[in-house]
């Protein structure tokens, strides 16, 4: 902008809504008033924006919906049941499909190359899953990228977008996959004004098809590139940075760099050897209790682990000591009560979308897609069950009793009134109408238990959140809310004002920082994980540990157990090989009891 580039010609892309929000705030602080504002977006939000505008060119309705993980899982369950594979894990099939889509592989190509029974099963499930998406006029996350990649093969649209955004910048470039690379390359075009920020040492998503090669080969892909090495670290103490350097330098497949701390040396890294996972959890909880008794704030403390199952025993210890905490990964928009309301919104907006290939257009009129209808038709109960819905979807409504047909007609009328509200009044008012007319509000108020009261508070919070879209022309605000819900990541759940200890996987911690960090479960087979197969990069586990270590600003605690309960049996444990990568002069064995209090002081 200082060189005269108009703000609206600049496109900045990152991976999470939280990161995009922080980027917007920083750009806003740097931008003089009246100079305009660049587009700052996540990859998936950018793709939604492009598909809303040009999607018809690739057969996408401008009113398409986006399926989240729960929507995808339920659809895959139906698919597998339909082909006699109901005992199979739908998430494994979805992961296999996502892996291929992320690599840019199309169904036709995959089907042609399928060599064994498993691959042929995946190909069949993929085909039927695609049909489910099409019937619902929906896209999953991978489709958002693939459809934009397909769209950019259109010379007219590609040229238009290249002229719209003449300067492209991408953060966390090491996390891009093959399709995202192609999108970036196509948007850059002849002007070649592209700036990327990336760190190979933090590439921890190759299992999601992130490609190290995108960053390693950047200078070959874009000749004339100028490389700026960012090696000064302003976050962590000198001791933490020295440990991080010692850990990551063991990896071979990286661009060499040596971080330099700008801060003081600081405290040593504290090691603790526990008897078992319970002893480890109590050490963590009691250490946090001492930190809180000192000058530390709960929101500046994080407990990290390799796998989600490790959180249970940690939660029990924190609860026992009355320490407030939150588990990152339980997303607001994935809570059942919130998804119920969103399903009403989506069903009302898409009330003319087909939900049964065998049903006539007259019989389908007034209903949304089967995912949402099956979720809301009995929430709250209205005398229409899943058996009735199955007959309706099969085009057998005429076979139903007249009383049941009357209930279906009333339900259609209800959706129509909701659709009218969403298309005419501000979104928050439309949501209040949906809560009242659907009976959801009455259902929650009639249930007196504490859990239901909390559910209703979550629904009310959804209404509060929707106010931000009230200024949008209906029904655009509703579509934007649905997009926000579908594209949310774990990190977007984090409220910086909430004063609680954070529990999360190391993957979820990427991009975050805390004054005090506990990295738990540092044992062979757990961290590094034993879940390594022939396609897994063994260096990625070390990169993951490097990410964990560099989340800490002031204090870092590294814990491991001599034995751990795994799959119902007590197993002896061996300390993680990563611990031996740290110079022992940087570490100190953590004290317990009264001695520990003097250490914290």
Where are these regions (language model features)?
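P-loop NTPase Walker
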Residues: 1-62, 66-67, 136, 159, ...
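Conserved helicase NTPase motor core
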Residues: 4, 11-15, 19-20, 39, ...
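Short glycine-/polar-rich loops that comprise or flank the Walker A/P-loop
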Residues: 5-9, 35-37, 71, 190-193, ...
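Conserved RecA-like helicase motor-core motifs
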Residues: 34-39, 256, 322-334
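ATP-hydrolysis module of ASCE/P-loop NTPase motor domains
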Residues: 35-37, 56-143, 165, 229, ...
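Short alpha-helix plus adjacent loop in nuclease-associated cores
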Residues: 46-54, 201-206, 235-236, 326-350, ...
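Conserved helicase C-terminal RecA-like lobe
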Residues: 115, 297, 311-323, 335-336, ...
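Helicase P-loop NTPase motor core
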Residues: 223-226, 231-325, 347-362, 366-367
């Amino acid at each position: 902008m200082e060189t005269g580039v108009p703000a609206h010609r600049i496109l900045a892309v990152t991976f999470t809504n939280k990161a995009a929000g922080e980027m917007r705030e920083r750009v806003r602080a740097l931008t003089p008033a009246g100079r305009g504002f660049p587009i700052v977006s996540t990859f998936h939000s950018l793709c939604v924006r492009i598909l809303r505008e040009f999607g018809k060119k690739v057969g996408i309705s401008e009113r398409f919906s986006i399926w989240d993980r729960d929507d995808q899982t339920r659809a895959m369950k139906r698919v597998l049941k339909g082909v006699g594979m109901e005992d199979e894990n739908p998430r494994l099939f979805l992961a296999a499909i996502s892996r291929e889509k992320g690599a840019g592989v199309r169904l036709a190509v995959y089907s042609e190359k399928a060599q064994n029974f498993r691959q042929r099963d995946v190909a069949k499930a993929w085909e039927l899953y695609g049909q489910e998406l099409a019937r619902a006029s929906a896209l999953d996350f991978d489709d958002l990228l693939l459809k934009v990649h397909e769209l950019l093969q259109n010379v007219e649209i590609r040229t238009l977008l290249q002229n719209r955004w003449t300067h492209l910048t991408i953060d966390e470039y090491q996390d891009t996959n093959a399709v995202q690379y192609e999108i970036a390359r196509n948007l850059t075009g002849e002007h070649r004004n592209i700036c990327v920020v990336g760190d190979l040492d933090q590439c921890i998503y190759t299992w999601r098809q992130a490609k190290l090669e995108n960053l390693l080969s950047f200078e070959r892909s874009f000749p004339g590139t100028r490389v700026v090495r960012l090696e000064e670290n302003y976050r962590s103490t000198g001791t933490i940075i020295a440990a991080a350097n010692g850990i990551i330098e063991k990896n071979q497949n990286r661009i060499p760099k040596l971080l330099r701390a700008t801060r003081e040396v600081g405290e040593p890294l504290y090691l603790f050897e526990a008897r078992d996972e319970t002893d480890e959890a109590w050490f963590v909880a009691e250490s946090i209790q001492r930190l809180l008794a000192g000058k530390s704030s709960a929101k500046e403390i994080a407990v990290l682990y390799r796998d989600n199952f490790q959180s249970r025993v940690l939660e029990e210890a924190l609860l026992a000591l009355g320490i407030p905490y939150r588990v990152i990964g339980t997303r607001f928009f994935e809570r059942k009560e919130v998804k119920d309301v969103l399903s009403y919104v989506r069903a009302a907006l898409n009330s003319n979308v087909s939900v049964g290939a065998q049903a006539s257009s007259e019989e389908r009129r007034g209903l949304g897609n089967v995912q949402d209808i099956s979720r809301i038709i009995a929430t709250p109960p209205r005398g229409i069950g899943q058996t009735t819905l199955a007959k309706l979807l099969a085009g057998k409504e005429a076979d139903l009793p007249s009383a049941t047909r009357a209930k279906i007609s009333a339900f259609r009328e209800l959706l129509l009134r909701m659709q009218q509200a969403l298309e005419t009044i501000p979104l928050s008012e439309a949501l209040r109408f949906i809560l009242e007319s659907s009976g959801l509000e009455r259902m929650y108020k009639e249930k007196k238990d504490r859990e239901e009261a909390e559910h209703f508070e979550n629904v009310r919070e959804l209404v509060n959140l929707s106010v931000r879209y009230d200024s949008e022309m209906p029904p655009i605000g509703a579509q934007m809310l649905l997009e926000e819900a579908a594209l949310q990541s774990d990190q977007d759940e984090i409220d910086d004002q909430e004063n609680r200890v954070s529990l999360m996987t190391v993957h979820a911690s990427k991009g975050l920082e805390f004054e005090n960090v506990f990295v738990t479960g540092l044992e062979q087979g757990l961290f590094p994980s034993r879940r390594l197969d022939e396609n897994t990069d063994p260096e990625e586990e070390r990169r993951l540990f490097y990410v964990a270590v560099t989340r800490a600003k002031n204090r870092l605690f590294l814990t491991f157990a001599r034995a751990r309960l795994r799959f119902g049996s007590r197993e002896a444990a061996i300390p993680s090989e990563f611990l031996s990568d740290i110079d022992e002069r940087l570490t100190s064995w953590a004290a317990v009891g009264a001695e520990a209090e003097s250490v914290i002081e």
